[in-house]
């Protein structure tokens, strides 16, 4: 595609296909880079663009897509008999009075990868239409029980992963680097939030691609995978560096001073952790998506929880190990910290070149930074709350529960966001909401009703209390933490967790539809915001809960002491 160049496409009826492979002669002087680039397939660019040119009635112009009214009607007539969503499908969406020729799908220059990855699924060949019909049938046949059973196992796996992360954090908080360089605590929610910024976004994006039939071709599948992994590494490196800079600033504000070697250590630890953890989790996530497709499981239900099942544990363990190692080198090997940071930052241009070669990720590479960076800033504020709370010796018990409440809330809201996004991709067009999705968003609209999105919200909310009870009891059996499970503590903790997920699901219902109405892809834009809000809400509510428990006299701290 050339949507990012602003050059229009024109249909050629009797001309031979145009070769649009990217010329990399300009960089062939670097033999290593040339070898690396030669390993990356670029066939999908030619294939996708030529299919777009051959589509009857579709002429992409710049950032927008002009669609003929009769073709749009044909698409909706095809999918309309299978529609069993939140309400009756309103035919006004396909009214001939609507000016489709003048409609800009991508809302100006803010084009999203929805168009690069999914645009021909709305108007291309019959095979794509069949894939849409098949996907909608799968969704309409999914009952609440089947949905709950599919979500339950990965939800429990993700929960035990967050429990493990909390236990690790409870141990490493006593390490020298965490005691002498408390700004590391500010990094914890931001780096763990990369799971929501990157891993869950990747899972949701690929899940949507699977459900609309865009990963049926092996060439398209591997081009999507390689492009998304390269994009994720770029984002992880940049966000890791910015998170460290923000942590240094937040640590400098209270006292008005900082040490340069500590600032370099934070930056190097953050960048290295983000890069390594993101690469490992990305490979795992690709395996989960491909495996779900082969086994017939809806990846929307399992991909996002599994993306977080061991993500927190891996990220936290890598952060603790690298930061402690670099801290030990401060005295005699001071050059190690800057060397580590420079090494990982120097690899960023390579990933940028690879990601820019794939149409599914090229647009996100230019316009997808806003949600990722904003989410990092929101998570860092949660980290500041955690750092302040941990500094109080009476409230150290919060450490073991913070990854649990944040991780569970982020997992559940990511599932809901991914399902709503898939629903919109199947039954609507970017920039236009279904008739039943218009109006004011309130809790009753989110949780009351018989639509597929209402049912999923009900199922996810019902998992909060039993899930957290299991995880609390697991922490108790493992003798971890500094707080006993008194009835008052359990009640206050469960109330905080329930309020967090309730608010997140409500916000997700509004945010996903709002982003879709703006012509952007909710898979890339909503999940980072939602998981970051989950981190902030979870940490804040947990801190308030511990303060309340301390005030009313529930101060037992013998467990794990």
Curated annotation (Swiss-Prot):
Would I find RNA-binding among this entry's keywords?
no
Q: Which reaction does it catalyse?
A: Mg(2+)(in) = Mg(2+)(out); Mn(2+)(in) = Mn(2+)(out); Co(2+)(in) = Co(2+)(out); Ni(2+)(in) = Ni(2+)(out)
Mark the transmembrane ranges. 151-171, 184-204, 234-254, 271-291, 302-322, 334-354, 365-385, 395-415, 458-478, 488-508, 532-552
Q: Where in the cell is it found?
A: Cell membrane
What Gene Ontology cellular component terms go with this record?
plasma membrane
Q: Which residues lie on this side of the membrane: Extracellular?
A: 1-150, 205-233, 292-301, 355-364, 416-457, 509-531
Q: Which residues lie on this side of the membrane: Cytoplasmic?
A: 172-183, 255-270, 323-333, 386-394, 479-487, 553-561
> Which molecular function GO terms apply here?
monoatomic cation transmembrane transporter activity
Primary localization class, coarse = membrane
Q: InterPro entries attached here?
A: SLC41_membr_dom, SLC41_membr_dom_sf, SLC41A1-3
Official protein name in the record: Solute carrier family 41 member 2
User: Organism, per UniProt?
Assistant: Xenopus laevis (African clawed frog)
């Amino acid at each position: 595609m050339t949507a990012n160049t602003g050059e229009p496409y024109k249909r050629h009826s009797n001309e031979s296909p145009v070769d649009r492979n990217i010329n990399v002669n300009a960089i062939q002087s670097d033999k290593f880079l040339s070898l690396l680039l030669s390993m990356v397939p670029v066939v999908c660019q030619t294939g996708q663009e030529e299919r777009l040119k051959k589509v009857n009635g579709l002429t992409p112009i710049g950032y927008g897509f002009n669609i003929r009214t009769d073709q749009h009607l044909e698409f909706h007539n095809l999918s309309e008999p299978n529609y069993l969503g939140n309400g009756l499908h309103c035919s006004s969406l396909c009214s001939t009075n609507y000016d489709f020729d003048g409609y800009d799908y991508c809302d100006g220059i803010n084009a999203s990868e929805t168009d690069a990855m999914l645009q021909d699924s709305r108007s291309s060949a019959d095979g794509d239409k069949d894939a849409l019909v098949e996907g909608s049938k799968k969704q309409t046949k999914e009952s609440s029980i089947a949905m709950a059973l599919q979500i339950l196992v990965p939800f429990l796996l993700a929960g035990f992963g967050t429990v493990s992360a909390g236990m690790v954090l409870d141990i490493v908080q006593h390490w020298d680097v965490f005691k002498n360089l408390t700004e590391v605590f500010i990094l914890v929610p931001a780096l763990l939030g990369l799971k929501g910024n990157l891993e869950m976004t990747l899972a949701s994006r690929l899940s949507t691609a699977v459900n609309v039939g865009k990963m049926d071709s092996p060439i398209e599948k591997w081009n999507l995978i390689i492009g998304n992994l390269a994009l994720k590494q770029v984002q992880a490196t940049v966000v890791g560096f910015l998170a460290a800079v923000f942590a240094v600033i937040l640590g400098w504000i209270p006292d008005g001073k900082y040490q340069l070697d500590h600032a370099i250590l934070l930056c190097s630890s953050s960048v290295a952790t983000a890069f390594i953890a993101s690469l490992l989790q990305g490979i795992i996530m690709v395996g989960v998506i491909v495996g779900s497709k082969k086994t017939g499981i809806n990846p929307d239900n399992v991909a996002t929880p599994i993306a977080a099942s061991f993500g927190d544990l891996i990220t936290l363990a890598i952060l603790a190990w690298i930061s402690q190692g670099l801290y030990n080198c401060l005295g005699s090997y001071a050059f190690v910290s800057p060397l580590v940071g420079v090494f990982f930052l120097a690899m960023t241009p390579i990933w940028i070149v690879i990601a820019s070669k794939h149409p599914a990720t090229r647009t996100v590479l230019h316009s997808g930074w806003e949600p990722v960076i904003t989410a990092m800033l929101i998570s860092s504020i949660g980290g500041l709350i955690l750092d302040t709370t941990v500094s109080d010796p009476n409230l150290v018990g919060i450490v073991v529960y913070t990854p649990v409440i944040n991780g569970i809330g982020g997992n559940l809201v990511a599932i809901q966001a991914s399902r709503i996004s898939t629903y919109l991709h199947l039954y609507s067009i970017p920039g236009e909401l279904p008739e039943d999705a218009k109006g004011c968003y309130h809790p009753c609209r989110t949780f009351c009703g018989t639509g597929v999105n209402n049912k999923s919200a009900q199922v996810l909310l019902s998992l909060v209390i039993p899930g957290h009870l299991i995880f609390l009891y697991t922490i108790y059996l493992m003798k971890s933490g500094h707080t006993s499970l008194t009835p008052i503590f359990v009640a206050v903790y469960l109330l905080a967790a329930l309020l967090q997920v309730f608010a997140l699901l409500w916000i997700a219902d509004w945010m996903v539809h709002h982003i879709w109405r703006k012509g952007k892809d909710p898979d890339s834009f909503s999940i980072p915001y939602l998981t970051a809000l989950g981190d902030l809400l979870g940490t804040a509510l947990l801190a308030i809960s511990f303060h309340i428990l301390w005030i009313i006299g529930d101060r037992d701290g013998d467990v794990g002491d």
